[in-house]
């Protein structure tokens, strides 16, 4: 915990309050500087932390139901503080092939290498692969096993206090909590060895992972072999199960991922997104979001 400073906790407060400044709980926390110092003292002294969640079911625009875990703002500040404390080792181990919830990476990222859409276009346009293998982990957050994640933590960090705090904030009653700042980080930590397995063991040159959505490009035989080796690796090493409908597919059928359908020479926005775009275009907030999608195409 030698990196813990009041300035680091202050930065954690800034990070935690982004996009939440209008909430009463956040306003009350920010009005009293003592709240910030109490978090610093609590972590400095190694005092126990308890994170309580309330749960809310949300339905995404494509009809998918999720249970979101909502914690207090103070708990989110603690999570962001821990994330800053472990940032150096975490960032050093991240693969260049993962793109979600990482600063400087994602759709429309300023650097082409860290934009998954432009990366997929580059792979298809430059290397002309026979086809692709698109994989999705079944209930990734819910099926994450604590003992596996904590073993991954222990392989990276040796500070017992940090490890104990990570154990306290990483899980809720239903697995990795959807909606907390620490969960995407933990999911990447779970998949770090998998990313190396794809590159070093399977020798897959063209690979993109966005959270638990995985796509590999190559020839038919290599993709068939990769499917079964990946399924075995995920199950026996991480306790994850793939959805059953994955199979190598030729590029002429198009690649439907990340809201786009990729073809050799051109890219289209997914049909369901175009239909939602037509219905929501008059809403200025929705329009700006959809303009970002159109920019990617």
Stretch-by-stretch model annotation:
Residues 1-38:
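Non-catalytic, polymerase-adjacent accessory regions of viral genome-replication enzymes
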Residues 83-145:
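Active-site-proximal segment of RNA-dependent polymerases
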